[in-house]
Swiss-Prot record:
Its EC number is 6.3.1.2. The gene is glnA. It catalyses: L-glutamate + NH4(+) + ATP = L-glutamine + ADP + phosphate + H(+). It comes from the Bacteria. This is Glutamine synthetase. L-glutamate binds at residues 265-266, 320, 326, 338, 358. SUPFAM superfamilies: Glutamine synthetase, N-terminal domain (SSF54368), Glutamine synthetase/guanido kinase (SSF55931).
Length: 467
């Protein structure tokens, strides 16, 4: 049975009332439109749905606004939150007059990256295993006006609430700053909430394996089992969707901001990657039982600081990428060592041999981030880029002279965009990314840089008001 036939059968079996077609904007925010299920038949999956592309930031001008969404029948699932039974499906964006993929469609770049891998002859499939962290709060307020620039967060579980007064008393069990990794409840107060999130994902057909409290106060992570590049990018969007909505049902609010508060660890999105061509391409007899291709793949990722513009695309990303908070700052690699940008997780099975990029964060558009990482790695294999010797020391404690010899990740979104402007040819291979797409993306991100740089910050009042 075809994927379209499977989707239509699911609609019938589940007595679906509506079909929610979904796609992402360049920043990675999920967008949707809901159709009456009676309008969705076999032809719909081929002909798609017209929409106004000029209303999506960074896409079409109003005089060329018509765009078309083509549903991917292999991506369907039943929405767990809507009151009426609704089938959801992820879409690719195409030009209505030619039927060709729209050059700025993020999902289209992911699909093309997978096709490019196969066409290159290097591998048949790339597997991705992202690990996205997040914070759960009870109350978040912020203001950005000429007279007030401020934010305030609160959570009963927050380490700062040890002396707060509560109507039923302060029970005092909390994860302290940098003290949240793995204690049981009552310190881990979100056990049941995370369990509900994970169970919801299972009911949607997602492959999951675990959940736990993370290092920072109020910080958490759920585990996704690895899958194909586009599939896992879809899953990260579903992951965020479920977490936001389950938290909201319990009066909580979630953020995937990389660094929502000072003085504690930020949220990363570590990305595990492997390539298969009949067998695991990364298993071998080199360092850490890696193959030569795996080392070149690492070399490609470490060579390209411009990747940061796609894997760490927020001004806030670079408040996480600083020493002292378990975030990778140095462009180095090691087996098991978590202080470098790339880690080789220990495993007994050659089939599980993989590399882990530790610098990405969950503010990234997963389609663009995963495609960029794959393209950088493939560029490393094609050009046999040597990653240099592994760094098996604690990179956080290196003496200054050794530290100075190791290149770093970008220090700001401005720097990352400048690197991307200078060096992006590896992304253009196979037309996976296009110049038009990168230019549109960078224009949006430069707007964010200017907004951030031109807004006075409260700490500037603390440091300079009395000058």
């Amino acid at each position: 049975m075809s994927k379209v036939a499977d989707a239509l059968k699911l609609m019938k079996d589940e007595e679906v009332e509506y079909v929610d077609i979904r796609f992402t904007d360049p920043r990675g925010k999920l967008q949707h439109v809901t159709l009456v299920a009676d309008l969705v038949d076999e032809d719909f999956f081929e002909e798609g749905f017209m929409f106004d592309g000029s209303s999506i930031a960074g896409w079409k001008s109003i005089d060329q606004s018509d765009m078309k969404l083509i549903p991917d029948a292999g991506s369907v699932y039943i929405d767990p939150f809507y009151a009426e039974k609704t089938l959801c499906v992820h879409c690719n964006v195409v030009e209505p007059d030619t039927g060709e993929a729209y050059s700025r469609d993020p999902r289209g770049a992911a699909v093309k990256a997978e096709a490019y891998l196969k066409a290159s002859g290097i591998g048949d499939v790339a597997y991705f295993g992202p690990e996205a962290e997040f914070f759960i709060f009870d109350d978040v307020r912020y203001s950005v006006t000429p007279a007030k620039v401020a934010y305030q967060i609160d959570a009963d579980a927050g380490a700062w609430n040890t002396d707060s007064e509560y109507e039923m008393g302060n029970l005092a069990h909390r994860a302290g700053h940098k003290g949240g990794y793995f204690p049981v409840n009552p310190i881990d107060e979100a056990q049941d909430l995370r369990g509900e999130m994970l169970s919801t994902m299972k009911r949607m057909g997602m492959k999951v394996d675990k959940h736990h409290h993370e290092v920072a106060t109020c910080q958490h992570e759920l585990g996704l089992i690895f899958g194909g590049l586009t599939e896992q990018a879809d899953n990260i969007l579903k992951y965020k969707y479920v977490i936001h909505n389950v938290a909201g049902m319990h009066g909580k609010t979630v953020t995937f901001m990389p660094k929502p508060m000072k003085g504690d660890n930020g949220s990363g999105m570590h990305v595990n990657m492997s390539i298969w061509k009949e067998q695991a391409l990364f298993a071998g007899d080199k360092y850490a039982d890696l193959s030569q291709e795996a080392l070149w793949f690492i070399g490609g990722i470490l060579k390209q600081p411009s990747v940061n513009a796609l894997t760490n695309p927020a001004t806030n990303s670079y408040k996480r990428l600083i020493p002292g908070f378990e975030a990778p700052v140095l462009r180095a690699y090691s087996a098991r060592n978590r202080s470098g940008c790339v880690r080789i997780p220990w495993t007994e099975s050659p089939n599980a041999k993989r590399v882990e990029a530790r610098f990405p964060d969950p503010s990234a558009n997963p389609y663009l981030a995963f495609a960029a990482l794959l393209m950088a790695g493939l560029d490393g294999i094609k050009n046999k880029i040597d990653p240099g010797p592994a760094s098996d020391k604690d990179l956080y404690d290196l003496p200054p002279e050794e530290l100075a010899a190791i290149p770093t990740v970008c220090g700001s979104l401005r720097e990352a965009l400048e690197e991307l402007e200078k060096d992006h040819d590896f992304l253009l291979a196979g037309d996976v990314f296009t110049k038009d797409q990168l230019e549109g993306y960078m224009a949006l991100k430069w707007e964010e840089v200017y907004a951030y740089e031109h807004t006075p910050h409260p700490v500037e009042y603390q440091m300079y008001y009395s000058c």
